């Protein structure tokens, strides 16, 4: 079976809001702030089961997220010991017979900032989110990434860089999506950090996406 390594990203320390968001939304072993985390997204998705099996048998990491959807599969594992997480990553790469350098280079598909969000729009956003609430008058940053898994990298780095609220993050599917809220200045700083994090990831260039 030929495997495409779509996302492979190591987070040295989960930030408080992202760790808490994962804890609220995931169905596995929930992480806490400060733990190291590894996110792996592959195609075809069903192969993610073999990935989880290999990582858990070889190391002490715990999985929070395993998603098998139509085309892609996503796995998150975490541990306080960064060495355990890195070892899990090496095991996964060996199992799939791929290299980290062969991962897809992420693209920013959409990035937008809405200033002074109206009250009615905040209600719509909050009803469809699982994180912090956005309040009327705050600024909203929306980011879409391809592959989807890199949305968590953007979220983690944005939280490191600015005092913002993590409204929602979706790291699986065709595109990853990130919603952040806060003051105008803090959102500007968060957006810059999130996009810089995506640009910093090396990998195999993708063909430009075309909506058919």
UniProtKB/Swiss-Prot annotation:
<comment type="similarity">
    <text>Belongs to the EutL/PduB family.</text>
</comment>
<keyword id="KW-1283">Bacterial microcompartment</keyword>
<feature type="short sequence motif" description="Pore gating residues">
    <location>
        <begin position="69"/>
        <end position="70"/>
    </location>
</feature>
<dbReference type="InterPro" id="IPR037233">
    <property type="entry name" value="CcmK-like_sf"/>
</dbReference>
<dbReference type="Pfam" id="PF00936">
    <property type="entry name" value="BMC"/>
</dbReference>
<protein>
    <recommendedName>
        <fullName>Bacterial microcompartment protein trimer-2</fullName>
    </recommendedName>
</protein>
<dbReference type="InterPro" id="IPR044870">
    <property type="entry name" value="BMC_CP"/>
</dbReference>
<dbReference type="InterPro" id="IPR000249">
    <property type="entry name" value="BMC_dom"/>
</dbReference>
<comment type="subunit">
    <text>Homotrimerizes to form a pseudohexamer. These stack, with the concave faces together, in purified bacterial microcompartments (BMC).</text>
</comment>
<feature type="domain" description="BMC circularly permuted 1">
    <location>
        <begin position="4"/>
        <end position="106"/>
    </location>
</feature>
<dbReference type="GO" id="GO:0031469">
    <property type="term" value="C:bacterial microcompartment"/>
</dbReference>
<comment type="function">
    <text>A minor component of the bacterial microcompartment (BMC) shell. Expression of 5 proteins in E.coli (BMC-H (Hoch_5815), BMC-P (Hoch_5814), and 3 BMC-T (Hoch_5812, Hoch_5816, Hoch_3341)) forms 40 nm artificial BMCs with a molecular mass of 6.5 MDa. One of 2 stacked pseudohexamers in the BMC. There are 20 BMC-T pseudohexamers per BMC, composed of mixed BMC-T1, BMC-T2 and BMC-T3. The shell facets are 20-30 Angstroms thick, with 1 of the stacked BMC-T trimers protruding to the exterior.</text>
</comment>
<feature type="domain" description="BMC circularly permuted 2">
    <location>
        <begin position="107"/>
        <end position="211"/>
    </location>
</feature>
